Amino acid sequence: MTNLRKTHPLMKIVNSSFIDLPAPSNISSWWNFGSLLGVCLIIQILTGLFLAMHYTSDTMTAFSSVTHICRDVNYGWLIRYLHANGASMFFICLFLHVGRGLYYGSYMYLETWNIGVLLLFAVMATAFMGYVLPWGQMSFWGATVITNLLSAIPYIGSDLVEWIWGGFSVDKATLTRFFAFHFILPFIIAALAGVHLLFLHETGSNNPSGLSSDADKIPFHPYYTIKDILGVLLLILILTSLVLFSPDLLGDPDNYTPANPLNTPPHIKPEWYFLFAYAILRSIPNKLGGVLALVLSILILAMVPFLHTSKQRSMMFRPFSQCLFWILVADLLTLTWIGGQPVEHPFIIIGQLASILYFLLILVIMPITSLFENNLLKW
């Protein structure tokens, strides 16, 4: 009798994706983040579902309902902080996953990469809308500032902003629709992740060397299932440590003050995972220019495959490109730091220089260096 997992219409899909999937024998722990992102998404959907059972999306009661969840609901504080810090873990895994893709040339799988960029945008949109829901000071003013950026779009800008707000300011209509979108988007993300995997399994995984691994494949189970479980355990260890010991470490104290349209906080800033993009936005004195730079800072990832000039796929054997990659990482960390600082000297000029370097590295310096490396090897 044939094995059921290989013949059953549903089981054979699972089998070909997670059990008998041929995988390269040399993929390192940098390949764990895909499964970790899946786990993060499941954690976020489950905790979010239980939060939605107690949350009310009304400006008068939203803040109180979050307080009620933390004080009166059984383990409500745990669910709330798992959800808030789960978002931070999600973004840490996302950034490492994208960084891995850039380093090892995984972006050469165009469809997989472009759906990944789309996923990044979707997760960022979801996180932004989720941050508005507790209706604290930073929620309200963050929503006001970021949605207001759309008014920089010529001709239709101001109409577009009022359409998104559902009125003339961020109010009840805005909060209600943000809650609706925040609820639906994770399911769209899950569907997109399925398509992401579908395209990945068409080509098979890349590996650290960037060479074809067709000659040396091993089954996904048990090798990489065990490896993924180790990653998941480490993720859960870090997440629970964060939630149980310092749940507010990555949050903003201003969000414990209920939203007040008449009182602007001294420093409006988004969550830590948006600070790099926020720094790029602020470094350009022109509103429309800032918005374009903000969008391009993420959209530039879609251009990376077309800027690949090296004859080698991975950076494993390219020391100069490696050096530039780590400069890019340092630059992004600098931007993240600047995004959280007030707009004053010397932070303004540091932010502007870091923003210029970010775009220069990706668009100019790295492609030219790759050509230089080809030349060194007489390719």
Curated annotation (Swiss-Prot):
Matches recorded under InterPro entries: Cyt_b/b6_C (IPR005798), Cyt_b/b6_C_sf (IPR036150), Cyt_b/b6_N (IPR005797), Cytb/b6-like_sf (IPR027387), Cytochrome_b (IPR030689), Cytochrome_b_C_euk/bac (IPR048260), Cytochrome_b_N_euk/bac (IPR048259), Di-haem_cyt_TM (IPR016174)
Q: Where in the cell is it found?
A: Mitochondrion inner membrane
**Any GO molecular function:** metal ion binding
Tell me where the transmembrane regions lie: 33-53, 77-98, 113-133, 178-198, 226-246, 288-308, 320-340, 347-367
The UniProt note on the cofactor reads as follows: Binds 2 heme b groups non-covalently.
What membrane topology does the annotation report for this chain?
A: Multi-pass membrane protein
* Sequence positions that bind a ubiquinone: 201
Disulfide-bonded cysteines: none
User: Cofactors per UniProt?
Assistant: heme b
One of this protein's GO BP terms?
mitochondrial electron transport, ubiquinol to cytochrome c
Q: Which GO terms describe its cellular component?
A: mitochondrial inner membrane; respiratory chain complex III
Miscellaneous notes for this chain?
Heme 1 (or BL or b562) is low-potential and absorbs at about 562 nm, and heme 2 (or BH or b566) is high-potential and absorbs at about 566 nm.
Subunit and partners: The cytochrome bc1 complex contains 11 subunits: 3 respiratory subunits (MT-CYB, CYC1 and UQCRFS1), 2 core proteins (UQCRC1 and UQCRC2) and 6 low-molecular weight proteins (UQCRH/QCR6, UQCRB/QCR7, UQCRQ/QCR8, UQCR10/QCR9, UQCR11/QCR10 and a cleavage product of UQCRFS1). This cytochrome bc1 complex then forms a dimer.
Q: Which family does it belong to?
A: Belongs to the cytochrome b family.
- What is the name listed in the Swiss-Prot or TrEMBL entry for this protein? Cytochrome b
